[in-house]
A protein has these predicted regions:
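All-alpha RGS (Regulator of G-protein Signaling) helical domain and cognate RGS-like helical scaffolds
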Residues: 2-424
């Protein structure tokens, strides 16, 4: 879609409720197992240990035996993962074009963005046509189609902020599942697509006056996390739309979320970090001019568009008290209000901070049935790389289960609510 399209909340009655389910479900959760007993390779000398199948071709690897590639999903896991990715590509195609249609040239100029910047965003939308075509072809005739969407932004700054958040979800969602795909051929194509998504996310951060890449590693998240974030902005889909199997988790909100539009980003009113009641909503940009950093031509404080910004007052810091509220499960959400938020977790006890390669827990102090607080951790990935930075993810959990990037999805049964944290 290009130009202005119909957008707004869904007002009808859903004809289907809940995620798509298999005919049989074998267990309530995936049980943790010890390391793979065949994963024993170790090369202490740095020499070839096994016969080479051909010259200049070390032994091993997947899909390296000469078999002709088949660029199609190869399991239910593959199908549901790529279908989720296609939902993401469709909304981005509509979103980028919609912002260009609803805001004038003058609106963009007030935000410091020129005709060249608008052309750049238009080209990103064109990129999404290619991504959507690729994923559709790898899914076949049951591939999801484009839907109608409900966006939260009211200004160009809020449009850009929403873009940097939704592309963060798109990128991190793929990093979370790409190495679990049964089809290595599909993973190859997807990796060459998501590399472009990463550049889009960085570009929108630059347009918002944030540091383009303040981390050493990008974050991967489970599919149910990506779907939880994304589905809130899909108003309705065609009646025969392919549905998804992923869980919709309850929303978690940061009451004192940093506002990147502010001269002092932590001096925010409660819930100023959201223009609405959805977790990827942009921060309020309509603040008094003497409190705004947008047109402030002072090094260290200006947050107008730039290749890079280094703010004197960071958006967050270790030890910051983070005030939280969250929703109860059972909320109708997503396309046609046909999905329902759910959780299998017990009482929340911890806040999980998911950023870069790290999963860090901090204790949660409850202040009510659906409110509490914690403190931003000072954890590092490696020395000199604070883990909590960038546009990252937080979750309430009932335990502090040890997990790593490759098996992070095993946290899902323990998640009470899920949110996004604007750390930097």
């Amino acid at each position: 879609m290009t130009g202005f399209t119909s957008h707004g909340p869904y007002s009808g009655t859903p004809t289907t409720i809940g995620a798509v389910m298999a005919n049989t479900t074998l267990a309530t959760a995936i049980a943790p197992l010890p390391p793979n007993p065949t994963a024993t390779y170790y090369n202490a000398q740095g020499v070839l240990l096994n016969p080479a199948p051909a010259p200049y071709t070390p032994n091993g690897g997947l899909g390296t035996n000469g078999t002709e590639p088949r660029y199609m999903v190869n399991s239910d896991f593959d199908f549901e993962s790529i279908a989720l990715g296609l939902y993401q590509e469709w909304i981005e195609l509509d979103l980028f074009n919609n912002g260009l249609a609803v805001f004038s040239e003058e609106d963009f100029l007030e935000a410091g963005l020129t005709a060249e910047d608008r052309a750049y965003i238009a080209f990103m939308a064109i990129q999404e046509t290619g991504h959507a075509t690729l994923l559709t072809n790898m899914l076949g005739e049951a591939a999801p189609v484009q839907c109608t969407y409900n966006y939260p932004f009211r200004t160009v700054r809020e449009f850009i902020d929403f873009n940097q958040k939704i592309t963060r979800v798109g990128e991190s969602g793929v990093w979370g599942f790409i190495n679990h795909l049964d089809s290595r051929e599909v993973a190859q194509m997807l990796s060459q697509s998501i590399a472009t998504e990463a550049r889009q996310q960085m570009s929108f951060r630059q347009m918002l006056g944030l540091h383009p890449m303040p981390v050493w590693f990008e974050t991967g998240i489970p599919q149910s996390w990506a779907w939880t974030f994304l589905s809130q902005y899909i108003s309705s889909c065609p009646a025969n739309q392919t549905r998804l199997a992923w869980q919709n988790l309850p929303n978690l909100f940061v009451v004192n979320q940093a506002n990147p539009n502010r001269l002092s980003p932590n001096d925010t009113a409660p819930f100023e970090g959201y223009v609405g009641n959805r977790t990827l909503d942009p921060a309020y940009s309509t603040i008094p001019s003497n409190e705004s950093c947008v047109n402030l031509n002072v090094t260290g404080y200006n947050c107008g568009p730039a290749i890079a910004r280094n703010r004197s007052e960071p958006l967050s810091f270790p030890g910051k008290q983070v005030n939280l509220t969250w929703q109860a499960p059972g909320l109708a959400i997503g396309p046609n209000n046909s999905y329902v938020t759910s959780t299998t977790a017990g009482q929340p006890q911890f806040v999980a901070w998911v950023s870069q390669l790290n999963l860090t827990y901090t204790p949660l102090t409850l202040t009510g049935n659906y409110s509490g607080y914690t403190y931003q951790p000072a954890s590092e990935v490696y020395q000199g790389d604070p883990a909590a930075n960038d546009t990252m993810f937080i979750a309430l959990t009932d335990s502090d289960i040890f997990l790593t990037p490759f098996n992070l999805s095993m946290i899902n049964p323990h998640v009470v609510a899920l949110g996004l944290y604007q750390a930097g």
